[in-house]
Regions:
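Beta-strand/loop-alpha-helix module characteristic of Rossmann-like adenine-cofactor folds
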Residues: 2-4, 8-13, 21-24, 31, ...
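Amphipathic alpha-helical interaction segments
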Residues: 29, 49, 161, 182, ...
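Amphipathic, non-membrane alpha-helical segments in soluble helical-bundle scaffolds
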Residues: 149-156, 177-184, 203-210, 229, ...
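Active-site flanking loop/helix segments enriched in acidic
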Residues: 165-192, 197, 201
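Histidine-centered active-site/metal-ligand motif
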Residues: 180, 220, 247
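An amphipathic alpha-helical micro-motif enriched in hydrophobic residues
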Residues: 187-195, 203-229, 233-241
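Charged mid-protein connector segments
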Residues: 226-272
Length: 272
């Protein structure tokens, strides 16, 4: 607002560190307004200095993430991760907490401040200590190197890779010979075992049995993919579309007056 007030009376030069189109929210806000003309003049991106200082090649894949606004599900740990805008201890703590959901406490991360300048500071620390003695600076980034697959076994894509391997040319003979028909009895068996775990109110057992049931879904999906008919993405997409369609009171503008009204509309939608 201050800039827009001043530009009413005079032309302004608004200078930012690095390239104006890189991680500069104020520049984006200025470009969105239509009352005044904005000319963007390029500068050297600080990412160039960052890659040089860290000695990494972005061709291997990297994600550039705003440390003040991101969701854990967006992170691709197979790539180089660079968190920008980590300008104080509170943001560093948020980044650390999110990463600890997926990575071990001792995983190495690198704090880099003022990359490429005479004041450049680089320090590699254990993830669990990322926010300890953090120096406040608006030129600080955090680098997370690519994570090995065995650290990511709780991610869905790793499960998919494992099932593909089991069904692949060098996979398990038992898994490779299975068909939709041969797996039918196992699907039924796993459902009953899940019901028993629920009856016992055993959370650990429920987790295990849900995994066994998911295995059946993954095997059937891989069989479908191997035959060229469908993939797990088709299964997920079909389910997601169905849930959105059958919940117009959540994802649309429909209103419900009672649980009986909800049940009635649900049954009507199922018939279509």
């Amino acid at each position: 607002d201050t800039l827009l007030q001043r530009v009413k009376n005079e032309s302004l030069i608004y200078a930012v560190p690095g390239h104006p189109m890189l991680a500069e929210k104020t520049v984006q806000l200025l470009l969105q307004q239509t009352e005044y003309e904005v000319t963007v003049l390029g500068g050297q991106s600080y990412l160039d200095d960052l890659f040089t200082s860290l000695k990494i090649d972005p061709i291997d894949g990297f994600q550039f993430i705003d440390g003040t606004s991101f969701e854990r599900r967006q992170l691709d740990y197979r790539s180089h991760l660079i968190f920008c805008q980590v300008y104080d201890q509170f943001i560093a703590s948020d980044v650390k907490i999110a990463l600890l959901e997926d990575l071990p406490p001792h995983y190495p991360v690198t704090i880099i401040d003022a990359a490429g300048s005479e004041r450049e500071r680089i320090e590699t620390v254990a993830l669990e200590t990322l926010d300890h003695s953090f120096i406040q600076s608006n030129l600080t980034s955090v680098y997370v190197p690519p994570v090995q697959s065995y650290e990511l076994n709780h991610h869905f894509y790793r499960l998919k890779e494992v099932i593909q391997t089991l069904r692949g040319p060098n996979g398990c003979p038992w898994d490779r010979k299975q068909t939709h028909e041969s797996l039918r009895e196992y699907a039924l068996e796993e459902v009953y075992e899940l019901i028993e775990a629920i009856h016992l109110e055993d959370d650990e057992l429920i987790v295990e049995e849900l995994g066994d049931l998911l295995l059946q879904v993954m095997l059937h999906s891989q069989i479908g993919e191997d035959a060229g008919y469908f993939t797990i993405d088709d299964v997920i997409g079909t389910l997601t579309n169905k849930m959105i369609y059958r919940h117009p009171h959540v994802f649309g503008d429909n209103m419900i007056e009672s649980m009986s009204d909800l049940t009635k509309k649900w049954e009507q939608l199922k018939q279509k």
